[in-house]
């Protein structure tokens, strides 16, 4: 799905800046922060402000077009993949990896639904040291 269509599908009025931000999120699966998106797009969009990037990413998250990740206490990151999945944050290199959701996630969601609840969000975060940093024997002190 193109970014323009995705915005419409989530009741977000498309603008040049919103399309650019959605496109960036969809093309860069790196879980970027507001600063990452702003730094990448501002050279080609001189009128883009960091506030616009923040407000747009927040709107995309609120409308279900993106996920807001609060796995890192210092940054908020965003993910265009809104399917049920987990995230792993490497405490050394700060890379965020996508992972399969725990097998119990769907089971728990079904149980809550059977009890009359409506689940709107589930977040599964893991933190540790990634295999690349372990390979390089990098330690957190």
PLM region descriptions:
Residues 1-11:
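Short, Lys/Arg-enriched N-terminal segment that forms or immediately precedes the first helix
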Residues 6, 23-28, 40:
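Short amphipathic alpha-helical elements of helix-turn-helix/winged-helix folds
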Residues 14-16, 28-33:
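Short capping segments at the starts of secondary-structure elements
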Residues 19-24, 36:
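Pre-recognition alpha-helix immediately N-terminal to the DNA-recognition helix
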Residues 36-45:
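DNA-recognition alpha helix
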Residues 53-63:
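Basic amphipathic alpha-helical segments that dock to polyanions
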Residues 62-141:
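Non-DNA-binding regulatory cores of transcription-related proteins
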């Amino acid at each position: 799905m193109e970014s323009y269509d995705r915005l419409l599908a989530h009741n977000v009025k498309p603008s040049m800046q919103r399309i650019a931000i959605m496109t960036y999120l969809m093309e860069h699966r790196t879980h970027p922060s507001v600063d990452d998106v702003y730094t990448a797009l501002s050279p080609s969009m001189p009128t883009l402000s960091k506030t616009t990037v923040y407000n747009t990413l927040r709107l995309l998250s609120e409308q279900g077009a993106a996920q807001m990740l609060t796995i890192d206490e210092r940054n908020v990151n965003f993910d265009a993949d809104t399917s049920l999945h987990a995230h792993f944050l490497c405490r050394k290199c700060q890379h965020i990896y996508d992972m399969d959701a725990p097998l119990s996630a769907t089971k728990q969601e079904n149980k809550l639904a059977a009890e009359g609840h409506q689940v709107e969000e589930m977040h599964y975060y893991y933190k540790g040291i990634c295999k690349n940093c372990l390979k390089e024997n990098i330690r957190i002190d």
